[in-house]
Structures are given as C-alpha cells and as structure tokens.
Amino acid sequence: MESKELKNIIPIQSIWEDLDLLEDRLIEISSSSDPYLTEISQYLISAGGKRFRPLIALLAGKLGEGDNKKIIDAGVSVELIHLGSLYHDDVIDDATTRRGVVSTNKQWNSTLAILAGDYLLARSSELAAESLGLESVKLLASTYAQLVEGQTKEVQFSYDTNHGTEDYMKIIQGKTASLIKTSAKLGAMASDSNQESVNFISEWAWHNGIIFQITDDILDLSSDEQTLGKPSGNDILEGTYTLPVLIALKKQPEKIKKILSDVSDGKVILKEVISEFNNDEIISESKLFLKTHIEKSENAAMKIEDKDIRNILLDLNRYLIAVSYTHLTLPTKA
C-alpha cells in the first residue's frame, strides 16, 4: 500500500502530520543507551513500511476528543509490537529479505534479531504503561499472546498438506487480525471515545485484518519481488500454505501435493507452476472467504456516526481488495 494512495483514501491532513510525529516518537522510544542495540532495533524502522497499524490507531483517534499525544503513543505501541514480531518471524522463517533490504537475521545474526525484537516488545509495554494505562497494557499483552498462538499454529502446519482452511483462518486471526483490531481499539480508547464507537471500529478492524491478510496472501502469489519486498511465492518456499494453496489442494489433492513436494525438493522451479495457485478459479474461491468479512466489516463501519471516518473505513476495505485482484467485484458503498 503506497503512501500516495493511502493519502488519497485518508484525506485528513492532521493524520499525516501526526504520522510524522509518530515516526519521530518511534525513533525516540526504540533508542537504547547501547548504540549497537539501537542500530539493530531501528534497522527495520529505517527500511520503511506502510505503517498501516499506527495509521488505523490515528484514524480511530479521531472518534474522540482525547489527548493527541496519547493517541500517537497508542500508534507507536502497536507498531513496536508489529516490528518486534517481524524480527522474530524472520528468524523463524530464516528469511533473507524484509521490506526490500537484507533481513536482520542475515545482516547480523539470529540471536541479535531475537534480542532486538524482544527489546522493541519491551519498549511497547513500557510506553503503554507510562502513557496509556493498565487497561491498554493488558490489551497489548493479550494481543501479543494471540499473535504468538497464531505464529505457533503456522509453524505447526509448516509443509503440512493435510490441514485446511479452518486452521488457516485461526492462524490469520491470531497473526494479523488481532493486532489490527487492537490498533483501532487502542487509538479509540486513547481518544476517550464512547464505548459504542470503540466497539464498532474494533469490529471493523478485526474483519479488515482478515481481509488484509487474505489479500496479502493473494499478492504473494500474483505480484513481483519489487512490489512485495520479498520473492514472489515466498510463503510456499517457506512451507506456509495460505488460502489459495489450500483451495488448490482441496480441488486437486494428489497433483498439488506432488507440485509442493517437488518445489520443496528443488525438482521444480516455483515460477513454472505458480499459475496453479493464482488462476481465476482459485482467486474466485478465495473471494468467497472475503465476502463474509467484507460484509461484517462494512456493517460495523456503517454504525460509526462520523461520516468522514465511516467512508474512509469503507474505502480502506475496497483498496485492500482491489490492489490484490483488480477485477474483484466490490460491494457498493452506502
């Protein structure tokens, strides 16, 4: 998601000004008294990224009239958790690239990548305790527990061709939807928004997070390395079989199992068989999984009183879907 496109979707100038302040705060909070740790901990911050989760926190912060500094700190807290989890993910996956640069575990080593991830997670908790209060600290801790559960389940099913879409949904709910939901909830809470608005935007974000991950998994199979910042089809190479692959497995189990085995063994180059997972039939079935979450996310958004925020939330859903597969038929905006 390019920043220019996001700016068109979120035409609220103060949010982008706050995002600049958030970036400065992110650097401040991730700094250590040890320059070496600071360099490693800020490596992925410097590499860029969409900052989607803190943007959601800032957007949710517009639902109330709370302290702007607290709203920014809410965004920093969720981004620190996201960044810390990326450091750990790259060690788990033995990744070589992240955000278009050499991954931290390869630039330094796995031990330092784990320690830097731990440091960012600790700083998130410290910031939340100082700025946001006990309820927010508990929410962040609970969210990270869900993230770990999702990641554990993903590792459990690595290279496993016998698990199905139900397991996949549990994985992405833990790994992705939980933190996007918390981003919205934390931002709304920090703004002193009323409880109804907190609930509505949290529900929107939960389903948006599922949409986000499914569309990202489609992109992994249909986009190029320059766009992704990592090799196309990287999930398959790492033994992570996402929704399109699981659908293909269900339709032609023996054929797809052999293809995946041959790719894993190096007998077949992935790009020669990737069309088995990103053709129109597979994408159309993936779209059916999106449909329920699009409807639930948009129903939640429609309950938000602020019309400008409501329309931005609807447009964010549409953008995520359109960017992954341009000819998906999208629901009409109310």
Can you describe what each PLM-predicted range is?
Residues 2-8, 102-104, 160-167, 272-280:
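Short, charged, low-complexity loops and linkers
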Residues 2-25:
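N-terminal amphipathic/basic leader segments beginning at the initiator methionine
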Residues 16-21, 27-257, 264, 292, ...:
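Mg2+-dependent prenyl diphosphate-binding active-site environment of isoprenoid biosynthetic enzymes
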Residues 245, 297, 313:
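Hydrophobic, well-ordered secondary-structure elements that form the walls
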Residues 256-301:
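Mobile late-domain/C-terminal helix-loop "cap" segments
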Residues 304-312:
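Flexible, glycine/charged-enriched surface loops at secondary-structure junctions
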Residues 322-324:
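Acidic, proline/serine/threonine- and glycine-rich low-complexity intrinsically disordered segments
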Residues 326-332:
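Conserved small/polar residues in nucleotide/adenosyl-binding loops
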